[in-house]
């Protein structure tokens, strides 16, 4: 078992402790202050019974959804573009100058023909200050979920520059989805500290577990409306959105902030 997973489970245990109310109030308020979190859409920091409850806070003011394909989460755009071919594999960038194999990222969640015309992608990084829940970016059907075991490196920009193939090395869950235009994937990449990802539609998907093995689960008639909640990270992480070529036209710039509900593609 890797040190990153052991340390993440320890951090998760501590984050889940419900301290006496006054102590928890101080912990939460200092966390909010340190990360400069805007709490205007959420309950007051003192109302969360643990640090993990603060991490996974729910919106108190519903977001309005813009027209088109919306961001599944809050975060920062780290990279956006089209894949390139090398040695008959499709490659994308985690960050400028650092490429990885899309086939390795997706593992068993694709058929070869689904990638033959190329792919477009966007990487959304969720920092510790961001809203940690993720949602359906459009009316869609989830066809399958593929769990791939791995380590839990931090996924911030500094580590992406230092560690090659980081997304491929980290634990992740890939959702294969379909809308009226075609196939796309939502890849939820685990990260150091806690490392937990939860999916509302399948509680049996367990991440950062002591015993783990790769698997794929297929679903029938698992439909979601645009904006419907899919699950949440515990602490920050990354969502990689990959679509068949021509399915989506991304209107994004690297480095820009994004909010769940805002349009990211036509």
Swiss-Prot record:
<dbReference type="InterPro" id="IPR003817">
    <property type="entry name" value="PS_Dcarbxylase"/>
</dbReference>
<feature type="site" description="Cleavage (non-hydrolytic); by autocatalysis">
    <location>
        <begin position="236"/>
        <end position="237"/>
    </location>
</feature>
<keyword id="KW-1003">Cell membrane</keyword>
<keyword id="KW-0456">Lyase</keyword>
<keyword id="KW-0443">Lipid metabolism</keyword>
<keyword id="KW-0865">Zymogen</keyword>
<dbReference type="InterPro" id="IPR033178">
    <property type="entry name" value="PSD_type1_pro"/>
</dbReference>
<comment type="subunit">
    <text>Heterodimer of a large membrane-associated beta subunit and a small pyruvoyl-containing alpha subunit.</text>
</comment>
<feature type="active site" description="Schiff-base intermediate with substrate; via pyruvic acid; for decarboxylase activity">
    <location>
        <position position="237"/>
    </location>
</feature>
<protein>
    <recommendedName>
        <fullName>Phosphatidylserine decarboxylase proenzyme</fullName>
        <ecNumber>4.1.1.65</ecNumber>
    </recommendedName>
</protein>
<dbReference type="InterPro" id="IPR037192">
    <property type="entry name" value="ERO1-like_sf"/>
</dbReference>
<keyword id="KW-0670">Pyruvate</keyword>
<keyword id="KW-0444">Lipid biosynthesis</keyword>
<comment type="function">
    <text>Catalyzes the formation of phosphatidylethanolamine (PtdEtn) from phosphatidylserine (PtdSer).</text>
</comment>
<feature type="modified residue" description="Pyruvic acid (Ser); by autocatalysis">
    <location>
        <position position="237"/>
    </location>
</feature>
<dbReference type="GO" id="GO:0006646">
    <property type="term" value="P:phosphatidylethanolamine biosynthetic process"/>
</dbReference>
<keyword id="KW-0594">Phospholipid biosynthesis</keyword>
<comment type="pathway">
    <text>Phospholipid metabolism; phosphatidylethanolamine biosynthesis; phosphatidylethanolamine from CDP-diacylglycerol: step 2/2.</text>
</comment>
<keyword id="KW-0210">Decarboxylase</keyword>
<dbReference type="InterPro" id="IPR033177">
    <property type="entry name" value="PSD-B"/>
</dbReference>
<keyword id="KW-0472">Membrane</keyword>
<keyword id="KW-1208">Phospholipid metabolism</keyword>
<dbReference type="GO" id="GO:0005886">
    <property type="term" value="C:plasma membrane"/>
</dbReference>
<feature type="active site" description="Charge relay system; for autoendoproteolytic cleavage activity">
    <location>
        <position position="237"/>
    </location>
</feature>
<comment type="similarity">
    <text>Belongs to the phosphatidylserine decarboxylase family. PSD-B subfamily. Prokaryotic type I sub-subfamily.</text>
</comment>
<dbReference type="Pfam" id="PF02666">
    <property type="entry name" value="PS_Dcarbxylase"/>
</dbReference>
<feature type="active site" description="Charge relay system; for autoendoproteolytic cleavage activity">
    <location>
        <position position="135"/>
    </location>
</feature>
<dbReference type="GO" id="GO:0004609">
    <property type="term" value="F:phosphatidylserine decarboxylase activity"/>
</dbReference>
<feature type="active site" description="Charge relay system; for autoendoproteolytic cleavage activity">
    <location>
        <position position="74"/>
    </location>
</feature>
């Amino acid at each position: 078992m890797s040190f990153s997973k052991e340390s993440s489970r320890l951090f998760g245990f501590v984050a889940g402790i419900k301290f006496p109310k006054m102590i928890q109030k101080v912990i939460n308020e200092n966390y909010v202050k340190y990360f400069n979190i805007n709490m205007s859409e959420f309950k007051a920091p003192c109302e969360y019974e643990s640090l993990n409850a603060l991490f996974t806070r729910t919106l108190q003011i519903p977001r309005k959804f813009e027209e088109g394909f919306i961001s599944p989460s809050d975060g920062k755009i780290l990279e956006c573009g089209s894949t390139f071919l090398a040695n008959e594999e499709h490659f994308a960038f985690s960050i400028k100058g650092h490429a990885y194999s899309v086939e390795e990222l997706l593992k068993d969640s694709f058929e070869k023909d689904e990638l033959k015309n190329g792919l477009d992608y966007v990487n959304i990084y969720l920092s510790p200050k961001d809203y940690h829940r993720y949602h359906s970016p459009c009316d869609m059907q989830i066809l399958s979920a593929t769990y791939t075991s791995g380590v839990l490196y931090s996924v911030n920009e500094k580590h992406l520059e230092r560690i090659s193939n980081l997304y491929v090395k980290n634990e992740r869950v890939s959702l294969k989805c379909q809308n009226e235009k075609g196939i796309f994937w939502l890849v939820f990449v685990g990260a150091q500290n806690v490392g937990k990802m939860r999916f509302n539609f399948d509680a049996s998907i367990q991440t950062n577990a002591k015993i783990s093995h790769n698997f794929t689960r297929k679903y029938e008639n698992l439909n979601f409306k645009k904006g419907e909640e899919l699950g949440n990270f515990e602490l920050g992480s990354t969502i990689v959105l990959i679509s068949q070529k021509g399915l989506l036209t991304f209107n994004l710039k690297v480095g820009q902030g994004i909010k769940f509900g805002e349009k990211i593609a036509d």
